[in-house]
Design a protein with these regions (language model features):
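Extended intrinsically disordered or low-complexity regions, especially N/C-terminal cytosolic tails and loops
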Residues: 1-79, 110-125, 129, 145-189
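Short conserved catalytic/interaction loops centered on acidic-Pro-aromatic/His motifs
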Residues: 135-149
Length: 189
């Protein structure tokens, strides 16, 4: 099995897992009672509000798992002397975050033409921002800069409800599609 097949297998496993999770969330969700203590200040999303952030983080973890391996794959395949780790040490070369650093390594060192994959890269970068809010702020945008909060509000399939990031099923599926497309393009380059 080659690296592209491994990625395809992981994506299909994730699709199956997400399908089951969403079915569980739908079956388990219920509308909160209006008589409940605290009433309307709580979000009426049921269990799905916990499932979707988990799924978004899983999609980004898939990308974050495979990109360093793809960098190593292309380093070995191209007999490149500069490793990803060495590239990361040079502050003038690396990106503002790991995702940008991987992309720069693949395009500048491994010389892959990823121009056609820029729409997927941008969607993965959006996913990275959303994932960071889930992981580092519990989904709350109160402490984010206005610029980051506005960026998140403009993302398709993402909304803010009472200063909490909410993602749709469509956001999850499209993020997984873009992750798969981007990783497959790199694996097959």
């Amino acid at each position: 099995m080659n690296i592209a097949d491994h990625i395809a297998f992981d994506v299909e496993c994730m699709r199956d897992y997400f399908t089951r999770l969403l079915a569980f969330a739908k079956a388990s969700s219920r509308t909160p009672s209006p008589k409940r203590v605290g009433g309307p200040q709580f979000l009426p999303f049921g269990i799905a509000c916990f499932v979707r952030p988990h799924m978004a983080c899983n999609v980004y973890s898939l990308v974050d798992f495979w990109l360093p391996r793809l960098c190593f794959y292309h380093q070995q395949r191209g007999h490149l002397s500069l490793s990803l780790e060495d590239f990361k040490q040079d502050k003038s070369k690396r990106g503002r975050n790991d995702l940008q650093t991987y992309s720069k390594y693949l395009s500048k060192v491994a010389r892959l033409d990823l121009l056609a994959e820029q729409p997927s890269f941008r969607r993965i970068d959006d996913l990275r921002e959303v994932r960071n809010v889930f992981m580092h702020a519990g989904g709350h945008v109160l402490l984010l800069s206005d610029q980051k909060r506005e960026r998140i509000e403009r993302m398709p399939g993402v909304s803010l409800e009472m200063k909490l990031v909410v993602v749709t099923d469509q956001f999850i599926w499209q993020s997984l599609d873009h992750a798969s497309q981007y990783l497959q393009a790199i694996a097959r380059a």
